[in-house]
Every structure is written in C-alpha cells, then in structure tokens.
C-alpha cells in the first residue's frame, strides 16, 4: 500500500506538503472559485507518487470560504459546478498562497510503502486504484480516482484550519493521461463524501 502520512513537522514548499502555499510557475494564475475568489491550497506532492517514473508535481486546490467553512462540502461532487482543481506543474516559481497565508504553514507529507493489504472498507489516506467509498461510487468522465485522503489527516496538515474536511474523505480524480500532459495545466478535480 502507498500510504500518505501527514506530519505536524513544518515543510519547505519545494518538498511534499499540506497547507501553506506552493511554487506555481510565474505564468500560471492561482486557481479561483466560481465567484473569482482564490482557492485554498490543500497539498502538493510529486507525480511519481501516483504514476511511477512520471515527472512534475501535483497541487490540489478547493474553494474555501472563511465565513462559512463548510460551504465547500456541498459543491465538491462529481456533478457539474465542482470548481476544485488539481494542477500538474514543475515545482518552481514564486512562493504564493493565494491570500490564505494565515490559515496554516506548510507541513510535511510522507509516502510510506507497506505490505499491508488494501481493504475495501479501509479509509486510510493512500494512493491506490483500490478506493473505499464512504457513500456511493463516483465517476468523472475521462478521469480515474487515484487517491483518497481521510479528512482527519487534513486536520494535521492544515492545523491552523481544523475541520476543513472533518468526518469525510476527499477523493482525487486525475485525467487518465495526466502524466503525459504538458506542464503547467489542469489535470483533475476533487470530490468529497461526508457522513
């Protein structure tokens, strides 16, 4: 199993991390939501964690409203209107956080390879083709669900903003050929299921 471990240890933006900002190329605009507001950066990891031998980095963004911190829960579905973004890019450029500086500094994410079998109903944060759905299975045309992140792990990675995804699981859908796409570019989206 490729397990994702979220640590409280502070991280550099050039390393795999949750929270904080990220190093987007200077010619790439920060993702915005349907109202034009900057999205919250959730995490950045190497593409090789998902597709062995591939180059580049993946950064994950979600709409987030500081006044109503649960508003984004209802919008992150496989239906139309989902404004979340996964970007494929080189991990270079100017450090930015899209205006969410005060929420949480960057914290370490590690990939742990284990011999532990992947169980269908296990909600461990992981990179996998074997996904445990909290509710019903979701599908996004032209994409495959390649990763799931337990909401409790975001409470570690985004310690300054607890509850961003409490009581649920974030599912990462990437385009089936994402690792061959030109960088930088949009290559996926997030969905969220909660109990």
Show the residue positions of the predicted features:
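Preference for intrinsically disordered or flexible, low-complexity segments
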Residues: 1-195
């Amino acid at each position: 199993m490729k397990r994702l471990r979220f640590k409280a240890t502070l991280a550099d933006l050039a390393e795999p991390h949750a929270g904080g900002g990220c190093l987007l190329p200077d010619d790439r605009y920060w993702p915005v939501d349907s109202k034009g507001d900057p999205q919250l950066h959730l995490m950045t990891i190497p593409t090789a964690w998902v597709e062995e031998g591939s180059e580049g980095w993946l950064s994950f963004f979600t709409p987030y409203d500081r006044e109503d911190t649960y508003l984004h829960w209802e919008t992150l579905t496989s239906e139309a209107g989902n404004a979340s973004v996964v970007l494929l890019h080189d991990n270079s450029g100017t450090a930015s956080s899209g205006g969410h500086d005060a929420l949480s500094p960057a914290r370490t994410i590690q990939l742990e390879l284990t011999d532990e079998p992947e169980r269908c109903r296990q909600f461990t944060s992981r990179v996998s083709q074997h996904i445990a759905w909290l509710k019903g299975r979701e599908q996004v045309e032209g994409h495959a669900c390649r990763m799931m992140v337990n909401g409790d792990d975001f409470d570690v990675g985004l310690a300054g903003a607890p509850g961003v995804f409490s009581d649920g699981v974030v599912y990462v859908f990437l385009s089936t050929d994402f690792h061959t796409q030109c960088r930088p570019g949009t290559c996926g989206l997030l969905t969220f299921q909660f109990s």
